[in-house]
Amino acid sequence: VVAAGANPVLITRDLVNVLEDAIR
């Protein structure tokens, strides 16, 4: 997970990737 304070968009994309991995 991207460190706090980083680009919110990058954090969102990282979370989406985690969710996609969980769905697969």
Curated annotation (Swiss-Prot):
Q: Which residues form the signal peptide?
A: none
Quaternary structure (record): Oligomer of probably six alpha and six beta subunits.
* Ion transport listed as a keyword: no
Tell me the protein family, please: Belongs to the chaperonin (HSP60) family.
Q: What is its main location?
A: plastid
* GO CC annotation, single: chloroplast
Q: Cite any additional comment in the entry.
A: This protein shows ATPase activity.
Subcellular location, record wording:
Plastid, Chloroplast
Which Gene Ontology terms cover its molecular function? ATP binding
Summarize the protein's role.
Answer: This protein binds RuBisCO small and large subunits and is implicated in the assembly of the enzyme oligomer.
Alphabetically ordered keywords of this record: ATP-binding, Chaperone, Chloroplast, Nucleotide-binding, Plastid
Say yes or no: keyword Chloroplast present: yes
What is the protein's name according to its record? RuBisCO large subunit-binding protein subunit beta, chloroplastic
